[in-house]
Amino acid sequence: MIQGTTSDAGKSTLVAGLCRLARRAGARVAPFKPQNMALNSAVTADGGEIGRAQALQALAAGVAPHTDFNPVLLKPTSDRGAQVIIHGAARMNLDARAYHDYKPVAFDAVLESYARLRAGYDTVIVEGAGSPAEINLRDGDIANMGFAERVDCPVVLVADIDRGGVFAHLVGTLACLSDSERARVRGFVINRFRGDIGLLEPGLDWLRAQTGKPVFGVLPYLHGLLLDAEDMLPRQARSAATRDGAGVLRVVVPALPRISNHTDFDPLRAHPQVEFTYWKSGPVPAADLLILPGSKSVQRDLQWLRDAGWDTVIRRHLRYGGKVIGICGGMQMLGRTLDDPLGLEGAPGSVPGLGLFDFDTTLLPHKTLKNVTGQLALPGAPAVRGYEIHMGDTRGPALAAPALQLAADDAAGGSRADGALSADGQLLATYVHGLFDTPAACAALLAWAGLDGGERIDYPALREASIERLADSFAEHLDLRALYAEFR
């Protein structure tokens, strides 16, 4: 089991790389995260949803994503509450205290999934959540040491040296553990190191002497990896680096407080002719394309946009010929009204949308979870492959001019319409996530938004190359023989 001294220490990445190495060695390997808290999720082959990191790890392992890989997923709806997803299906919304009482039920689901994976795979690589040293969460823990102790799983502790204080993180984490938990930690991995490894050696010697545990490796900081991020938005804007005379497309996405599935925009951030910005505050920069992203709390995030003046920004942008895309929750915001009669995302009630499309959305308790294929309603009808994750039912005249035609859900074939494309061709709305992942669709959308002579990129291929690069680095910098010996 891989546990971390902090959130974002590198647990997910370490599991992904180890999954790829196990696959290279011919093992049938599965990733497993007992409990995940994330707003970025993926649709599985068995029709549920799991954390995005586990979907990436499944890709690294060469297996189809399955709900057993992440049996408990918590999707925050507010600072104190979350939607609880068990075995891929939304069960209820709970605040933190109520979820604490529910944990024994959630733990049963965790153990069921783990047992199935142990029976079906040669190797299961487990990822913890956050840090095992959260004293206030120790009672009833199902994500870190509580799970490891229950199933007798050895632990490797990973720490991010790029943050600073790596030795304090490692030794301090051990100090917060019980004797049995501390004994369960077999050793350490230090992540994101830059510089001369020789200058780090005295610290590593001290760590070994202080703890009596080995350091299995020091992993270098790998720049330019294109791997799905699960929680944190990228810290910096992405500036285009183009050839002389090549076009540049400016794309701005508001960093909504409850933004979901921001992995939709990874292909744009990777595109050499896209200047990409997540807007958080201050003046909205000039843009060719504005994209309203998905949201786990659409009404609240819409109010946040209004408070920031984005309703005026969008209308001015359209007056000057700019293009706008709304994805999932962003699509719902573009309509006339948002109705939440059951209070699924907050207090029951209805709020006006931005009024740019003639349709209305009602939030319903049933969540749509589908992997989809189809074609964009743009020149050349480019192919699209993506997924739907939403609780909204949208209806209205604007849907008569759909943005996509998707393959029908049943065996009868045919197609079904999705989203809307405005009569003036400036607005596009869709429920489909992953819109830019397919090379042809990405190229067509960027051309529609105004990019002349755009380069076509294959984001899935770039992501696969990043996984390979990650595994190569691990093979070079980890003592795999010593690491594997602890787990046999």
Curated annotation (Swiss-Prot):
Residues 248-441 form the GATase cobBQ-type domain. GO terms for molecular function: ABC-type vitamin B12 transporter activity; catalytic activity. Keywords: Cobalamin biosynthesis, Glutamine amidotransferase. The keyword Aminoacyl-tRNA synthetase does not apply. One of its GO terms (biological process) is cobalamin biosynthetic process. Pathway: Cofactor biosynthesis; adenosylcobalamin biosynthesis. The keyword Nucleotide-binding does not apply. The active site is at C328 (nucleophile), H433. CDD domains: CobQ_N, GATase1_CobQ. InterPro entries: Class_I_gatase-like (IPR029062), CobQ/CobB/MinD/ParA_Nub-bd_dom (IPR002586), CobQ_GATase1 (IPR033949), CobQ_N (IPR047045), CobQ_synth (IPR004459), GATase_3 (IPR011698), P-loop_NTPase (IPR027417). Belongs to the CobB/CobQ family. CobQ subfamily. PANTHER family: COBYRIC ACID SYNTHASE, DETHIOBIOTIN SYNTHETASE. Catalyzes amidations at positions B, D, E, and G on adenosylcobyrinic A,C-diamide. NH(2) groups are provided by glutamine, and one molecule of ATP is hydrogenolyzed for each amidation. HAMAP family: CobQ. This is Cobyric acid synthase. It comes from Burkholderia vietnamiensis (strain G4 / LMG 22486) (Burkholderia cepacia (strain R1808)). The gene is cobQ.
